[in-house]
Amino acid sequence: MIRLIFWPTLVLGLTGLTAFVLTGITLVPTTVALGPCLRDFTSPFWEERASPLASTTFEVGDGAVRVCYGRPSARERVVFGELIPYRQLWRTGANEPTRIYTNRTIELAGVRLVPGRYSLYAIPDTNQWRLFITESVTHWGNDLRSGTRDKDVGVGIVPADTTADYFETFTISAEPAGDSTLMVLEWERTRVVAGVRAVRR
């Protein structure tokens, strides 16, 4: 599969592939390249961010998944229910939308994703979150106009638990779970777990 991917600059060495940006567009075989975690071109690279860009990469079957996201910190604020209101759509991070890259077909929170690039949004609630996955990846994080939502590919519902550990900074990590993987979202004293598994081609 070949997809049109918009990049703001030259990208080299995507898992062994050299990709060149011409007029802002790169032709990247999504079955080969996960892609790098890049800032939006409107955000100057030399400016320090309060919520730095981070990534986590994990194996799923014979493929891999990469999650790129901004990491906001609590800074003595009440996060869920105040800073991040319950039952309202959230970009699941900060700045750019949280992006998911996969080079094989997977299910994330029950939503089937073919190889490609996606954005992840959430509606947090006290005991469960709704995860929205969209094919729109070139917008700013809080740009939720109809054109963005029209590209939704699915919604998954996952449990939200309270933990004894306190996470000052929003963190996305991965934990093995038998034949699948758990994508774990933690911030403040909230822990949300979404299952990720390989789907047979």
Residue ranges and their predicted role:
Residues 2-83, 139-201:
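Primarily secretory-pathway and cell-envelope proteins
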Residues 52-53, 86, 101-102:
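Short structured motifs
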Residues 89-143:
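Mid-length scaffold segments of soluble, non-membrane domains
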